[in-house]
């Protein structure tokens, strides 16, 4: 089964029963092996309405590549312009503020799932800003299924819970197996590839995967008892933790898997 077996419409809105998440993203993610998303704003609350699709994609040995912009404060921009601090550190810290706020609201099961996706390379995140410290504001999504068919969507929706089901947002969808739409899909794929690989001359991207993993593990550690992990200790995945995660993945993301967090350096 692939995208052609789905009743994919030309557009979706974020309201009602047939909203972006329920009627479009979850069904397509379940058939996908690659999900590429670039947005001006990302919140980890987005995982709530599409979690079933993400788990199915992971079972397909799929990958998610996410590019988003940080919400830079006036102080952040001034610090960058005046050279008070390393540009990458300021941008990463700004992105982390929103990232941590969002993931801290997730329950332990979803938080561990997110940690698993990042640790195993299923989910990779990069931060994008313009060379003048402006935000990257394009909103593009690309999905590829197991037979190579591609669906592209674009529109006003950011990658957030509000963007997918609370605000009034609209996306438009094009399909690679429709002759009149195939050329525009190739253009969007090239656009995303340049962004992801850092060859877009107007946008600078920074890796965030390791920072994301560290922030998630720190939150998990903070939720454990004092005897298991102290809140201020640096947290890293040990070999046996990687093995535990791998076993959980191999079991189809089922079962209660307690991931022990060591306070020791590896």
Positions of PLM-derived features:
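Walker A/P-loop
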Residues: 39, 252-266
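PLD/PLD-like phosphodiesterase catalytic module centered on the HKD motif
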Residues: 1-247, 253
